């Protein structure tokens, strides 16, 4: 029954818009390339991140995400280049994004302003042939392609200093719909189909050893309700951080981060579903590993938050 319900839900969403499995991450501050291409190069060194998310633990065929990103500043730090590979699975649906990221960066007052573009492809696969259909000759199943390669584009801007950041982006702004008569996917490009992301945060120094960093992620789609992530993070000696987040869908998130040395950071979070569906869906695990090569403490970045 769980598999059936999830498949029906995913199917209804996919028939409306394809290629729009937007990344969901508790650690968007340190994994920002997933939602904003202007983040490329902002670590001021070659940076590699591995991300894994297991959503709704205990719910069969629930969403799972894996991600690998690499980015660095080049050409006198004016340009940021990056590569993002992201895989999302929901039930019988699988989507893999391959994106090359480019950012143009300029110094502005005590920080840097960046404009970014990501371009690549989305490889979409479904498992229609895995479904046990009552009628194996059902037209909807027979006329749906099992795979497709679709263009993908993201845009964004990002400003950051050692103490605060603000960003705006349109991730994966192209959408696609399935033409039932031809059995092919068609490109749709409309402002009403865009997702708008706004992020911001500031690090306060409570004492020489303790910091407090509130941040926020606002997601807006013209056809959906606004979703907001409110985040708080307390840091100790720039080595360990603990925090809580609240997502405006009755989701409470507990997180911890450890800076093992100047280059290696590990982050973990667990989502508690506080809604009436929480007892059926379970929580979600997320882990992020980040390694920065040739770290330089004297440049405007890396950010201290």
Regions found by a protein language model. Give the residues of each.
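Absolute protein N-terminus
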Residues: 1, 19-20
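Sec-dependent N-terminal signal peptides
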Residues: 4-13
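Subset of outer-membrane beta-barrel
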Residues: 20-305
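Positively charged n-region of N-terminal signal peptides that target proteins for export
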Residues: 1-4, 108-109
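Cationic, low-complexity basic patches in intrinsically disordered or flexible, solvent-exposed regions
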Residues: 15-17
């Amino acid at each position: 029954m769980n598999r059936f319900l999830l498949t029906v839900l995913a199917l209804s969403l996919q028939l409306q818009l394809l290629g729009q499995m937007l990344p969901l991450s508790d650690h968007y501050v340190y994994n920002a390339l997933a939602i904003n291409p202007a983040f490329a190069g902002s670590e001021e060194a070659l940076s590699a991140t591995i991300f894994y998310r297991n959503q709704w633990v205990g719910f069969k065929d629930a969403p799972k995400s894996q991600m690998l990103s690499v980015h660095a500043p080049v050409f006198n730090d004016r340009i940021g280049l990056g590569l993002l590979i992201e895989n999302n699975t929901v039930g019988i649906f699988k989507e893999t994004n391959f994106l090359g990221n480019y950012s143009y960066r300029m110094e502005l007052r005590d920080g840097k302003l960046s404009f970014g573009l990501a371009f690549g492809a989305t490889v979409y696969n479904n498992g229609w042939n895995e479904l046990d259909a009552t009628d194996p000759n059902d037209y909807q199943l027979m006329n749906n392609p099992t795979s497709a390669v679709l263009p993908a584009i993201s845009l964004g801007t990002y400003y950051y200093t050692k103490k605060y950041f603000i960003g705006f982006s349109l991730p994966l702004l192209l959408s696609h719909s399935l033409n039932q008569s031809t059995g092919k996917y068609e490109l749709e490009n409309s402002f009403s189909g865009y997702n708008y992301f706004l992020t911001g945060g500031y690090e306060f120094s409570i004492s020489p050893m303790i910091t407090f960093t509130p941040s926020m992620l606002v997601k807006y789609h013209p056809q959906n309700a606004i979703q907001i992530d409110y985040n708080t993070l307390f840091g100790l000696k720039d080595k360990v951080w603990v925090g809580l987040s609240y997502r405006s869908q009755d989701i409470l998130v507990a997180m911890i981060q450890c800076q093992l040395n100047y280059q290696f950071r590990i982050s973990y979070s667990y989502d508690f579903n506080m809604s009436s569906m929480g007892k059926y869906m379970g929580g979600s695990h997320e882990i992020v590993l980040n390694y920065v090569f040739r770290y330089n403490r004297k440049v405007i970045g890396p950010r201290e938050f």
